[in-house]
Curated annotation (Swiss-Prot):
The gene is rps15. Part of the 30S ribosomal subunit. This is Small ribosomal subunit protein uS15. GO terms for biological process: translation. Belongs to the universal ribosomal protein uS15 family. GO terms for molecular function: small ribosomal subunit rRNA binding; structural constituent of ribosome.
Length: 158
């Protein structure tokens, strides 16, 4: 598959083994996993970090192998668990990380205004932000009147 802003192919990576059910040796129930996710979120970990901790420390390969107890036709995800318990971030995490990158790059460009490579990088990051904002508005994760503003983004990112 090609990269978004380059005309070349991406690097190949390792693939997860195809599984449809949790491994037999896994002793955790859905309730145990929900409690672990909520506990880790309250400790301040991001969803990506929670998944890594569950994999490395608890031996849970992926949460998606389990079924959502509220809707058995849906896979369980860390984000759904956090939404259910009211711990989901108001701005989706991938969007927040891109906004944080854009803010840091703007700060760099204030000190180095002639850095044209970074200027181009900022344009690409902000294009990704606008594309994600459009998607999240359509899905209802962001309000319809939400806009990306670089000055307001500084306040969003601590």
């Amino acid at each position: 598959m090609a990269r978004m802003h380059a005309r070349k192919r991406g690097k190949s990576g390792s693939k997860r083994p195809p599984r449809t059910a949790p491994p037999i040796w896994l002793d955790y129930t859905v309730e145990d996993i929900e409690n672990l996710v909520v506990k880790l979120r309250k400790e301040g970990y991001s969803t990506a970090m929670i998944g890594t901790i569950l994999r490395d420390q608890y031996g849970i390969p992926t949460v998606k192998l389990f079924r959502d107890p509220d809707n058995p036709n849906r896979k369980l995800t860390i984000t759904r668990i956090l939404e259910k318990h009211g711990l989901a971030p108001e701005i989706p995490e991938d969007l927040m990380f891109l906004i944080r990158r854009a803010v840091n790059l703007r700060k760099h460009l204030e000190q180095h205004p002639k850095d044209l490579h970074s200027m181009r990088g900022l344009q690409l990051i902000e294009s990704k932000i606008r594309r994600l904002v459009k998607y999240y508005k359509r899905k209802g994760k962001l309000p319809r009147d939400w806009r990306y503003d670089p000055e307001q983004a500084k306040l969003l990112v601590r």
